[in-house]
Amino acid sequence: MNDYTILAGRLKRGILDFSEKICEGMPRPVMKLTANMLFGMAESRSCLLSKISRALHEPISLKKSIERLSIGLENLGESEAMLENFAEMARERIDDNTIFVGDGSDLTKPYGKAFECLERVHDGSAGKQEKGYWTLEFAALTHGHKTPLPVYDRVYSVSEAGYKSQANELFKALQFLRETYGSQGIRTLDRGYDSNEVYKEFFRHGELFIVRADKQRNVICKGKTVNILQAAKRLKGKYALPFTTKSGEIKYCKVSVQTVSLPALSGRQFRLVCLHGLAEEPLMLLTNLEQGDPRLNTAVVKVYLMRWRIEEHFRFKKQEYGLENFRVRSLKSIRAMHRFACLLTGFVALLSDDRNDSVLFSKLFHISQRIYPPKKSKRNGYFAHYAIADAISFVLSKTLVGIRKLLSNPSRSAQLSLPGFA
């Protein structure tokens, strides 16, 4: 027994309990696959099946272990039930003020040739076109620590059978949120989704939204059709808003609110919220929040002045677990691998969000040995995913047995069995 045996046991039990909850109503082999994948990815910090298999320490050959996981991923596919179960787990942290941040990203495989439905995508990191897949995710920002909880994810290709458009993929995500949480929360999207069809979808279902407007859009302001950027520049800023950037710099911004409508939706009223002082051009947001709604200004702060958290969420998955380094080739397996990465990120996020009440979080954060630990005044808003993931990997790597003993059915003791009935 080493100094981490008890802590490793708690982590294993936590991963197993988490796997059982997100696999509720599913066959036991699926739950066992989930526990193995989450444990292996957490210890190895990789999405390579070879490294995951080594972390499991199974009493079979490495080749057989890789084959077993590969077959399991292929059979699992998208696994909507897992997504629904995790969304239900997050329900207790969701209310009418919750911000659902939606954004698209990419999984690039620039040198890939044998991957199914591989197409050209825009690599946001490199700023150029590469081979890969599109992703769409929604995360719910918790109130206490602004922790992003991944409640929806999907990997798709424009060349796959049944693909229609990016707008249709967005409508699928919105429908999932609608079926899970009803009209709770505020849907927020970046300017890439500034579309009349998207606004019609929101109004049709009575959902609150905040969308960053494209500067090419025209609006009807005081009875005249004008460019939205020109309309925003006329507003001087009525409300003062001090803001601390990610680097710690304090900026003093001003917020203006103006009622406008759109030429294609003239019967609907929007609030144009402009944030001055953050950049050279004002930040322009279109929302259907009412003028007197107290969430109007707070939502702006949570969504766009804290938007780096959802971007950090994407970056965390790619850097911590090497998500773009996957080797599975079928689209079903890629989706399953991405789903497991999101679920593991969700497991870390739940630990991080309970930081004030969790002894486990305190121990893991101490083990992570951050070079620049957060100050007490900034501890609540600290993005702790990297620290927790590092500590989990370190603790689990100290064990010589994977998670298989917790998954196995213990044999009956012959001591308590009658002769002939054992």
Region spans (language model):
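Short, basic interhelical loop/turn and adjoining N-cap
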Residues: 55-68
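Single, function-defining residue in the core of a domain
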Residues: 1-48, 65, 113, 141-422
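Short alpha-helical "recognition helix" segments of helix-turn-helix
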Residues: 52
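Short secondary-structure boundary/capping segments within folded domains
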Residues: 27, 41-44, 59-61, 89-92, ...
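Active-site-proximal, Lys/Arg-enriched surface segment
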Residues: 38, 66-145, 256-259
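Short acidic/histidine-centered micro-motifs embedded in hydrophobic/aromatic stretches
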Residues: 55, 72, 320
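Short gly/ser-rich anion-binding loops that grip negatively charged ligand groups
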Residues: 42, 59, 72, 76, ...
